[in-house]
From Swiss-Prot:
It comes from Nitrosomonas eutropha (strain DSM 101675 / C91 / Nm57). Substrate binds at residues 90, 106-108, 256-258. Keywords: Cytoplasm, Heme biosynthesis, Metal-binding, Oxidoreductase, Porphyrin biosynthesis. Its EC number is 1.3.3.3. A divalent metal cation binds at residues 94, 104, 143, 173. Coiled coil: none annotated. Residues 238-273 are annotated as: Important for dimerization. This is Oxygen-dependent coproporphyrinogen-III oxidase. The gene is hemF.
Amino acid sequence: MDFAQVKDYLVNLQNNIVAGLEQADGGSFRRDSWDRPEGGGGTSCVIEEGNVLERGGVNFSHVHGKGLPASATAARPELAGRAFEAAGVSLVLHPRNPYAPTVHMNVRFFAAIKEGAEPVWWFGGGMDLTPYYGFEEDAIHFHQICKHALQPSGSEYYPRFKKWCDEYFYLKHRKEPRGIGGVFFDDLNQPDFVTCFNLTKSVGDQFLAAYVPILQKRCNLPYGERERDFQAYRRGRYVEFNLVWDRGTLFGLQSGGRTESILMSLPPIVKWRYDWSPAAGSPEAKLYTDFLIGKDWLPLD
């Protein structure tokens, strides 16, 4: 296990992604470095009211502490009470144009440390796409890049991590997926550190290729108040998932993370309506019937 190597990679990844997004948007991200009193810190890069991105954040954090929070030990009670060190890059981008999808990507490394014992470590991460008005070619492109990112590690990873993503980004209280998925993994520590690190790096390194072509294709499509209204309504689902179900958000808040950085994933304009559903056959209804269905977007090998 080489924590310094992982940290160096993550810092460079954040810089590379921000540079790519600034080129795509034409605007600049604000860089905000911060320290965590309990140990560690990070850098948040945020854009608001950009040319294409209404709000977006690319966050790097490296935190450590004496005791793991409850969200980190829920599945592994044997780690309770261990010291921890965690580092990751997490991003969420909310474009202004309703035809351009929201996207989330995260790669992270975690170590639970106890004196006199081997550290327990694992990687996690993934990326997923949340359209408001779906395009099949965009879903296929996104999943193709996800599959391509995992292919060098073995052909078994994409179907496994795709299924995991569909199951994780699911709003149980709404009984609907958050979006059209992608890939998601956690607790990855087999077969060895180098293999797991290489897989995680490949996911991070392929993010721009997965998302920027979709953003560029959709960001200039004409739209009106109707589309913005539906976008704001569907963004409400994003807020619900992040605040109710997301393990990363819960870990950040429970471990004394920086609230501004943790909640930068939330969209700037959101609406809720009581017991609303789109008219049958409308473009808005198509999102539910054709896209939020846990579909296999690529042919199964």
